[in-house]
């Protein structure tokens, strides 16, 4: 007997909230597989080959992964050559602004934004950076 993942209405709602972002971002793609659920691909924009993939089985995992990617995209736009855990207060504000249209559609997932920034802050407290 084979196992089939079910794409729930909640998963579809999350995917729909990120539709504009997914359509406009060339370095990622989101696919559905009945065998593993959502597959989040990162794509090399120069070679057009996949670089990595994540299997996402729940709406919460999907939302967290997409919010995290949006934050990374904002940081790449600042051209300061650092990763997500090194962002400053201004960058954190830009990330929140980017998240706002999505969270307005998914207010029950707003806690993930705080969780992502808190994780970044906890990683950076060791290095003396304050994101508050």
Question: Residue ranges of each PLM-predicted region?
Answer:
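Negatively charged, low-complexity tracts enriched in Asp/Glu with abundant Ser/Thr
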Residues: 2-25
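Acidic, low-complexity, intrinsically disordered interaction modules
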Residues: 31-114
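Non-Sec secretion/translocation targeting segments of pathogen effectors
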Residues: 129-132
